[in-house]
Amino acid sequence: MIYAQPLCYPRLSRLTHSYEALERRRRTFHCRNTCLFKNTLTVGTTISIKLICGLHYATQHTGSFTRHLLHCTSFAFAKLNVARCNYYTVHPSSPFLNFTFSLDFTHRTYKVTFINIEINYR
């Protein structure tokens, strides 16, 4: 397994403002990002993605936000074969990885503050 560090534009750590613009009581977040890889990926590459979500959750009594880390390891696109998925386009002339994911929280009110993406491929 080789670890690939993607070049993401804009940097995912700077997407805080766009997520904060969402309503605080919204329970499902749909996010889309495009990453450009330094290493060229070939069609048929198996890619696994792990999301680490930085969240703040609001208490119902005070409304204040407390730091909370949640590891999101189970979501729709955990492992996909590039050759069999239309959501992915990987070839030398356009080495982009496009993906969409959603987070669903049912117990508390959350605000997404940052998202880090680790991508491993072989």
Swiss-Prot record:
Further comment found in the protein's record: Partially overlaps SPT4.
Biological process per Gene Ontology, one example term: regulation of cell size
Protein's name in the database: Putative uncharacterized protein YGR064W
Lineage of producing organism: Eukaryota, Fungi, Dikarya, Ascomycota, Saccharomycotina
